[in-house]
Amino acid sequence: MIVSALNISEDITVDVDSAEPITQRERDRDYLELKRRVTQAGLLDRQYIYYAWKIPSVIVMVAGSIVVMAMFSGVLWVQLLNAAFLALAFTNLGFLGHDAGHRQMFRKVRQNDWVLLGVGFLTGMTPSWWQDKHNTHHRAPNQMDVDGDIEVSLFAFTEEQALAMKGIGRLTVKHQAVLFYPLLMLTALSLLFGGIAYQIRKERMRYPIAEPVLVVAGLASYLAVIFILLGPWYGAAFIAVHRALGGIYMGSVFAPNHKGMPILEKEDEMDFLHQQVLTARDVQGSPLADFWYGGLNYQIEHHLFPNMPRNNLKSCQVIVRDFCAEKGIPYHETGVWQSHKEILGFLHEVSRPLRQKKA
């Protein structure tokens, strides 16, 4: 088995091949033991009280933004700040949809689906498309030709990808470390249009009638509210700022999860426990960080236990970190700024061949 050993910082190099051979049965037993400890701690139990206030609080954020639109419709600077606030609210709606998609909220699948459909209506996201894409990522994180999150037209995550780029993609990849954050402004639109394309192709949809109806109705409502309350010019400015900042926010949350961590070839085989831990990065938690990242700063724990309610991930981290130390499994956690430093350094290094002068 070959895993690309990438230097994600000066101190961290992951090389799985150097580890002592362990049988598949032993590795499966390791994960079952970890799951037993986590279950015994009650961390997989549903958190109904948490979501009973979390869901309404995010809806209040959206409603508050609409109120500000109505009350200060003629004040541009207020509306631009309001657009930034709505970007925060919409991303938090996305976090709720993410939780529901992983069945973290309720035991019954349909109840989680109701939340996911509601998020689809409010944000314009197509639930089935997102679940299909995201579940594939969870099954094989950072695995070439499998994980769609490392198959992006404007970025390269291996030197082979960089050298294979053509046209505008080659230009953006050549300077991808510099262009990374500006290009994140396209994230929200990419997610929106990716879902619409999925619907047009009529691919697998859990709710083939409800999803298109809710998404179209939601987008129509979004545009109507903004343009009726703000008018065409202020409305257009509001949407531009909302979508751009929403993209940067989402991208800044998603990127630290796996970017700059080891990448597996398609033919590589790795047990569940090792693949989920070695390809993910945790960002140190705090009340502010936990809110900002929607719990996804505990990415290793989330990948090991996707259906764990997000407010239990911090407690789970203690168990997982100790278990990895016990088993000699590299566990990577860093701060917010260091995580972005690692990402940019990784992107710069991967694209280096495109900047080298030909002999």
Outline where the language-model segments fall:
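Conserved catalytic cores of large enzyme domains
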Residues: 7-10, 16, 260, 339, ...
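Short, contiguous pre-domain boundary segments
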Residues: 7-25, 114-117, 163
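Short, charged cytosolic
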Residues: 13-37, 179-190
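Conserved oxyanion/phosphate-binding beta-strand-loop segments in alpha/beta enzyme cores
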Residues: 26-35, 60-67, 268-269, 273-287
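Cytosolic juxtamembrane amphipathic/interface segments immediately preceding
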Residues: 37-48, 161-169
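Alpha-helical bilayer-embedded segments of polytopic membrane proteins, i.e.
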Residues: 46-93, 120-125, 174-191, 205-253
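Membrane-embedded catalytic scaffold of the fatty acid hydroxylase/desaturase
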Residues: 85-204, 265-354
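Transmembrane alpha-helix/helix-exit interface in multi-pass inner-membrane proteins
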Residues: 185, 250-267
